[in-house]
Amino acid sequence: MQSFRKIWNKPRPDDWMPLARFYYADSALNDIASELDSFDGRRDPDRCNALVTRLRVAQDRVLHIITEMLIHLYPREQDRACRDFRIKFPDEILHDTLPGQLWFGAECLSAGSNIIDHETESDLIRPLAKEVTKQLDILRDLLKNQSLRDPSAYNPVIKENLLKFDKLFAEFEYQYVSAMVPVKSVKEHDSQLDVAVLFSEVLSLALEKDLITQDLIDYCDPSVMIAIPRLGIVWGLLVYSEGALNVDVPAENLSEMFRPFYSLLVKIRNLLRILTPVELTRLETVLCKGETAVPEDSSSKLTMSDFRTNATDEEKAKNNQRVWMCDMPSDSTSSLDSDLRDSASEATSLASSGLTSPSSGSEDNLNRMVDKSDEELDDDVIETASSEENESDSNNENVEMVASSGDSSETESNSKENEEDVDEQATLQALAHETAEQLVAIKKKHEKHSKIIIPMQNEPRTLIDPKNLRSRFRSSEDLVHRLFVCIAGVADQLQTNYSSEIRKVLKIILQPSEVIPVYEVVNAQVANNSTEGEETGVEAQETLPLPAFMGVRWVPDEDCEQCTACSMPFNFVRRRHHCRNCGRIFCHKCSCNSISIPEHGYDRKVRVCNLCYVHRLNPFGCNEQSQASENNTGISSVAEQSSAQATSASS
């Protein structure tokens, strides 16, 4: 009986309804599965791999048709299973063939296989995989039987099983993907949203300051993608300091993207706080445009007295470091020398490279650029904290010993460098004496506690003097250049190491939201029963454009009594044929061609009219041909009229 039903009630192959398409997709899947089970895959592995690939494609096609049925029956998303968890998945997981891979994975788990290196997770989700495959088999039987009865109707049993399968499949998708790849937690997702909020505020502020134009955003210029993370670091540390880049909290509370750069962000914030408004504007411009030559105001130029003051401060810092190294062990001195040489070489290489974006190295390379200034900063913190607790009495012998060592070193340097002035030598000697006294007082004070307290790297440095911090840079351009290299380095490493997260954040703030038109019905009457309401809904849906997978609307048979092309009337011999491309009715002579139309869901060749066939083969020559045919028709009609007039005149 089932075979007779298949023969007489089998849907047409070119039918666009989901149930009719499901019938043939399920039949193709069964044929591939039976062929795969009929031979030993170890003897012919190439054929086995090809069949497995075809099987997964067929499974994916069946699941897509089932999804179309769910969307057709339940247009609202809240009526179907929730899949908001997909926002936690990586971008490489979300693709069109994901449903087929999930079905294949569920069958493998049901058969007893395990996910590689995830045996424990496989045992946990195996019962759910068995339930999914069982429910899918039941649903396939119901849909196939219904396609043989009436492909245009869905009974309540099918609707109930569709919803049940949708819920089970969504739950299996989350557990299976979570076992395969790392999925973000709620805290990590909230941190990513905080970064999106920060970048959105940065984009608005950049538009107000004319750093980024609306045309660049509309055309998705790459410079916008580069400038937003850079400006986000600057304004996230200065303007929106309580947001995603709040470095006053522990590093664990930051986003996963900025967590490796926590210590470097603290140093960048300290340098940003000493910038003048002119320097900050110059830094923002350089970060956005990458210009090596930025116009400089006359007020920001250094005079000779300022340069001498900066040089004196630098020499003072060097003398402080030299005297401090007199009391350090040889191993510590050698390690400090190596660090200073590394930082100096790094600064030299960066200065020679100009205002260009640094390569995406590690955080240690970026930290090394501010290492020298940071060491001097630690010395000043120790000196300031210790000078407040300095005792009145001091050891004069130790002072003289350290001072004499400083004098001898200065004498040797003066013998080598004859160009130095006498005033500068006296200044340096006085600084050496003063520094030696302070260091001896520090050592005498902390001998009771047997250790010197040095502030940690991640602790907020409240004792930083902006004047001393600024004096460590040669000029204002040097400070801006150092900040540019550090900020651009962090931003470029974000683009390289966290490209997926950055792409998601930029997509949130740059992609325009989809606008759904809302139609208002004026003087509408409320339906009295559910039947009228359902008819109103169907009538409203008729005016909306159909999706591509549903094909085109066919002209009803009763509305056309003759061929659309040749105008010959239809009879018992001359039958009606619909064109699958335009939906109009033609005779057999005017629709004898066949082509495939993938955009309408016809992968195999189907019947089309002659005009659509010519247009598909040569879309540019179709208009010329139609115009030529119209001209020939006009000429023939004129000839017929002239001959008729001649006949009437002769008669």
UniProtKB/Swiss-Prot annotation:
A zinc finger (FYVE-type) spans 557-617. Zn(2+) 2 binds at residues 579, 582, 609, 612. Residues 345-363, 395-412 have a biased composition (Low complexity). Transmembrane segments: none annotated. Residues 300-310 have a biased composition (Polar residues). One of its GO terms (cellular component) is early endosome membrane. Keywords: Metal-binding, Zinc, Zinc-finger. Zn(2+) 1 binds at residues 563, 566, 587, 590. GO terms for biological process: negative regulation of epidermal growth factor receptor signaling pathway. Residues 373-394 have a biased composition (Acidic residues). Pfam families: FYVE (PF01363). Residues 294-425 are annotated as: Disordered. SMART domains: FYVE. PROSITE patterns: ZF_FYVE. InterPro entries: FYVE_LST2, LST-2, Znf_FYVE, Znf_FYVE-rel, Znf_FYVE_PHD, Znf_RING/FYVE/PHD. The keyword NADP does not apply. One of its GO terms (molecular function) is zinc ion binding. Belongs to the lst-2 family. Negative regulator of epidermal growth factor receptor (EGFR) signaling. This is Lateral signaling target protein 2. It comes from Caenorhabditis briggsae.
